[in-house]
């Protein structure tokens, strides 16, 4: 995982026994629903970055459960290589960013996210937990 530039999380919580997935509004137009993620800072592990980004973007403290996969894409002429982790909701905290958040059922989350790779990560968790 040494060539990664970003890391993020698929945060799960239970609502009366039903799983919910955390989504945040992207800062850039068209302001899609996305999984929280951000740049890996010097000295951070990808797991630490995922946890920090979930805290900053969504105001959620979550524990890393396991590595899910990697999504590579290009944005503004730069190559982004992002690791994603399954994460378990711990508690709500104060967010560092003013972002809209949404807890969605896995089916809703898959329908709301724009990119197929993101939906694939959410589906993977569903299959693994069934």
Language-model features: where?
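Conserved Nudix-box catalytic region and its N-terminal flanking loop in Nudix hydrolases
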Residues: 18-56, 60
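Short aromatic/basic micro-patch
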Residues: 34, 79, 103
